[in-house]
Amino acid sequence: MGQTSCNALSDRLIVIKELVDRGLDPEGTHTILGLMGINAPDTATLAGVKLYSEYLPKAAEKPYTDEQRYLQFLWDSLEHAPLAPATNFAFPFRRIIAQRLFLHCGKNFCAEAIRFNLGQNISAGDDVFINAGTYIDAKGGVTLGNAVGIGEWVRIFTHTHSESDHAERTYAPVVIGDYAKVYSGAMILPGVTIGEQAIVAGGAVVTKDVPPNAVVAGIPAQVIRQRKTEGRCREQLNHTWLYDGAFQDE
């Protein structure tokens, strides 16, 4: 019975991937919502959907395509689906969406319940893992290197507002280097680059660049020491996120 249930989830994911790879329209989106266990609105209603991000200035500069709109809609809809707690459905589902929506999405991408705007401005390398509750403001562009780990409730921002004129915005990209780790509750501010293999401690507010292999903590974040690598680097650091490398087998 258990194996049959797993096969049923796999079969749904196969159909979802085929529909996504074909290019989403209201009909395909309606079908996928049903496969997610959601009582989907009719296709005419789906055709009129507008996302929050489409009311942002950056979206006015480069409007969403219909496909991008439906991909983002499906990503956000998953958290309201009966199958959302089923990790063996939710992880592959998000990967399917990210590989089509993101500017780039490498192999073995893993994400729990996270939110972002303008997913088309996110680039993720291989073996990226993002924990639940994280929010990515991608208006200015976000690049996540290979084997980056991001903890729960991390916030990444790429824009600010003028204090004297709220409508005046400044954008600056965030880059997190290969094998860096950002622990729970940290905040990364616009324009920051976090170096390879660096660690951002939980709750830190990062306002300036972090050197490679540095450990930073505090508000604002300051270098407190070097990462204890014991001579290891990159793959030797064994950024295997779940037991027995689950979902890192592409």
Go through the PLM ranges and name each one.
Residues H104-C105, F109-I224:
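Structural signal for interior beta-strand "rungs" in well-ordered beta-sheet cores
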Residues M1-R100, T229-E250:
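Terminal amphipathic alpha-helical/low-complexity segments used for targeting or macromolecular assembly
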